[in-house]
């Protein structure tokens, strides 16, 4: 994931920052508790495509 692109992207739900998880190929929104997939290097920032994060994944 291009770091410059990552700096521009925000969560479509909360407008907060996203953190890239290289291992899982996801963009994480801690405030929305969602993980957006990255497919073929392209972020899919659709709420309907995101998965809900567990407390364990959020470190809670």
From Swiss-Prot:
It holds the Pfam family Trm112p. GO terms for cellular component: cytosol. Belongs to the UPF0434 family. HAMAP family: UPF0434. This is UPF0434 protein Bpro_2950. It comes from Polaromonas sp. (strain JS666 / ATCC BAA-500). The lineage of its organism: Bacteria, Pseudomonadati, Pseudomonadota, Betaproteobacteria, Burkholderiales.
